[in-house]
C-alpha cells in the first residue's frame, strides 16, 4: 500500500526503530513537539474514502479512520492478559462470575420473598409479628444486594479484563455523518472484541443469570400491586363478606352490633380505649375516636391485645367527633339524606381526606374548619364537611351516631359511602 493509500484510510506510516509490539500498542497522532508545519499536516483532515472504499475497509481500518476523523490519539493500549488461559486469569474470571451469580441469587430471593413471605398485617404476638415486620426490610435488602452484586461484578470485569487504554481527543464541533456512524460502530465493535467477553462463557452465563433473576424479581415486585384484586370479598359484615374498600372498623359484623365511639388513652397502665360520653368533650371541641366493641376487651388477654391493635392500625377507623357550640347550631347545613346522622350538637366525620387519603387531622375551633396538612384541603364542619379550599372535591364521609341507654356515644350504622379518596367504582360524589 502506498503512502497516499495510508493517508486515505488514516493508517500512519510505520515508525522506524520500534518493535512490532510497540507498534501494536502505540498509535501516533499529532505531536505538539513537532514544528508548526508538521503539526498542521498531522491535524489536517484526512482524505475521506468513497463509498466503495468504505465498504471494503476492515474493522481495524475503520477504527483507525474513525480515530483520525474524530481527532483521537491512542497514547497507550494494553490488554490485561497478554497471555491467555493463565491461572490468574481464570481466578479473576471466577471472582467476577461469583459476584454476578450472587446478584442472581439475591434477585431470585427477592422474587420468592415477594411471592411467599407473609405480607399481611399481623397483630403483635411474638414470632408471627416478627416475621411480618421483616417483609419490607427483606424487599429492600434483597433488591439492594442484587443490584450491588451485579454492579461489583461489572466493575471488577472492567478492571480485570477491559484493555487498559489512554486516549486523547481534540474538541471539535460538527454533526454526525454516515462515515462517522460507521466508524463509531467500528469503535464499539473493537471495544466488544477487546473486552474478551465473547470467549468468557462463564462470565456471560453468570451475567445472564444475575440480570435475569434481578430483572424478574424487580418486575414481579413492581407489577405485584397492579394485579391484586381489590374487590375480593374478605371482610365479614352483617350483609355477608365485602371488599376492603367498602368497609371500615365501623362496619357492623352482625345486625344490631353496638360499636362505641372510644377515645385512645395513649397509656399502657390502663385500657387503650375508653368509651365516650357527651360530657367528655367541651362545646366547640374535637376528639379523635375509634370503633370499639365490648368483644374487643381491654387488652389484658392476647386475643384482646390483637383486636385493639387492629383498631389502632385500621386506616379507615379514625373519626373526628366535633361538638358544635349551641350558639352556632343555627348555622349548620346538613347533607341531603343525612339529616339524622348527628346527635344533637355532635357530628362525626372521617379523618381520612377525600383527596388522597391523607389524615385531615387539624381543626380550627373558632371557624369549625378541618384542615388536611398534606395538600391544604379545607372542609367546613358546619356545612357537612364540604370542601371549601384545596384539591379535595368531595365532602368527608359522615358517620351516623347516637347515644345508648347507658349514656355512651355509639355508631348508628355504617358510613353510607366509601371512606377516603375516589376510585372508579364508587358512585357517590
UniProtKB/Swiss-Prot annotation:
Subcellular location, record wording: Cell membrane
Region annotation Disordered: where it falls in the sequence: 1-45
Listed Pfam families: QcrA_N, Rieske
Cofactor(s) named in the record: [2Fe-2S] cluster
Domain spans labelled Rieske: 316-410
Binding residues for [2Fe-2S] cluster: 353, 355, 372, 375
Cofactor note: Binds 1 [2Fe-2S] cluster per subunit.
GO cellular component terms given for this protein: plasma membrane
Membrane topology designation: Multi-pass membrane protein
Keyword Ligase part of the UniProt annotation: no
Listed CDD domains: Rieske
Residues spanning the membrane: 96-116, 137-157, 207-227
SUPFAM superfamilies: ISP domain
Keywords: 2Fe-2S, Cell membrane, Disulfide bond, Electron transport, Iron, Iron-sulfur, Membrane, Metal-binding, Oxidoreductase, Respiratory chain, Transmembrane, Transmembrane helix, Transport
MF terms in GO: 2 iron, 2 sulfur cluster binding; metal ion binding; monooxygenase activity; oxidoreductase activity, acting on paired donors, with incorporation or reduction of molecular oxygen
Family (UniProt): Belongs to the Rieske iron-sulfur protein family.
PANTHER family membership: CYTOCHROME B-C1 COMPLEX SUBUNIT RIESKE, MITOCHONDRIAL
Protein purpose: Iron-sulfur subunit of the cytochrome bc1 complex, an essential component of the respiratory electron transport chain required for ATP synthesis. The bc1 complex catalyzes the oxidation of menaquinol and the reduction of cytochrome c in the respiratory chain. The bc1 complex operates through a Q-cycle mechanism that couples electron transfer to generation of the proton gradient that drives ATP synthesis.
Protein name: Cytochrome bc1 complex Rieske iron-sulfur subunit
